[in-house]
Curated annotation (Swiss-Prot):
Membrane spanning stretches: 32-52, 62-82, 94-114
Name of the protein: Transmembrane protein 243
Gene: TMEM243
Family statement: Belongs to the TMEM243 family.
Organism: Bos taurus
Subcellular location: Membrane
PTM sites of type N-acetylmethionine: M1
Main subcellular location: membrane
Disulfide linkage: none
Amino acid sequence: MEDFSTRTYGTSGLDNRPLFGETSAKDRIINLVVGSLTSLLILVTLISAFVFPQLPPKPLNIFFAVCISLSSITACILIYWYRQGDLEPKFRNLIYYILFSIIMLCICANLYFHDVGK
């Protein structure tokens, strides 16, 4: 009889991926680093929108802050659903893409707020 440890379940090799709800230590570290970096950059961007270049803030800076906040709320909802197990693991890549887009938006906003390139 075949040994259970050698079954491949239709994949090209041994399949040791975690099941739903299980995450490896590597995945947890990646999630913490990406989440912390994104949260810090969003916080810096929102503060910069209201403080720089002078008080009172420019309306365009407020618009940037609102757009970033709305994008962040969307990402937070997806992360919440993913952690609850309502989304399949393949949606993790979508969450990473959305967070990368938010990071790029924050970088663009900060460059605009601080008049870089003029």
